[in-house]
Amino acid sequence: MIKWMTGALGAAVVCAVASLGVSAQQNQMSFFVTSVGSGMGANLGGLTGADKHCQQIAAAAGAGNRTWRAYLSAAAAAGQPAVNAKDRIGKGPWMNVKGVVVAKTVEHLHSDANNLNGETALTEKGGAVAGNQHDILTGSQADGTLQTGGAPCGNFSEATDGTGAANVGHVDRRGGGQAPTSWNASHASRGCSQANLVATGGNGYFYCFATN
């Protein structure tokens, strides 16, 4: 009886330590790829809706103590100036859910020396993005500024089939397009609907960065 209780207590301690380890990793997480999109293609409810999505799924993963922002750019509209993705994500450094640093600063993030790739750009749950869903919405150029050619899918508020476009990056740094190894500006999407994004290797995912 005593031996059984000792064994059970030991197992409980191991589980508790493991749980604390996972919790600590989630608390230090400051970067992730969304494990789910809006389900409405590139219509994310604008940048505000995308930020809310980041915050909600981060909170569900135990990292809601941080302020999260979507890595998205938007064109000037309704009296508001254009927004560059690089200007809205804080200063860094940024770590994934496992504590691996993907970039130290904004400059490092947008350089060839960053550590963002298919093995490190994990979801908030710690999973890797499937290769056939590697297109990540950004609406940005490689330097983190707004894409050329107009508002990205109505500033991420439209999901019209076959109309409009938003730049996407390849999270695994491979594939086709004009710049297949770019994590944030590989090519433009072929429309803004969910079907359009899926057809070219995406699923409406985007990057989330903690600003603090």
Language-model segments: which ranges?
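Secreted/extracellular ectodomain signature
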Residues: V22-N212
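Bacterial N-terminal signal peptides that target proteins for export
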Residues: M1-G10
